[in-house]
Amino acid sequence: MEKKFYNFVKEVYDKQLGVEGIAIADGEKILMEHHFTPDQARNIYSHTKSYMSTAVGLAIADGKLSLDDRLAEFFPEAVPENAQPELFEIRLRHLLMMSSGFHEPYLMGANRRAGVGAPDYVKYMLSRPVKVQPGSEFVYSTADSILAGRMVEKA
């Protein structure tokens, strides 16, 4: 097995396959492992949404949040003076379902890398127009997840 393992490691290097690491385990015991890249922080992109939703669930279980909590009520300091009435209808449940009503994939891709909305994403998002009734339509949105996560932070 050891020879096959190291032959595979060599093949990964030779073919530049982009593998970060490999391990062979038996139950909980790691028998062999090899790391092709140094230990460093990685951007895990949308995996973060799973952790955020788990944190929301824990906060709900602890009584710190409710699915019916309203976004604008959590961040009154970020609500613009001329806010649309629909902004006050966005609830935590809408953020988790990516149906906030902003109806744009804000804070994704090139915009996020360029720092659009930074450093205050909450204030930035609460100044965006609500284009459809909250809860009515799904649009994949990093912004909705960021806002839900900020509600957890503040709870």
What are these regions (language model features)?
Residues 28, 43-68, 95, 148-153:
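Active-site SXXK
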Residues 15-16, 86-89, 116, 131:
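Extracellular/periplasmic catalytic domains that process cell-envelope and extracellular macromolecules
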Residues 62-102, 127, 155:
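Active-site helix/loop module of the DD-peptidase/beta-lactamase fold
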Residues 108-155:
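Catalytic-site signature segments of enzymes, centered on catalytic residues
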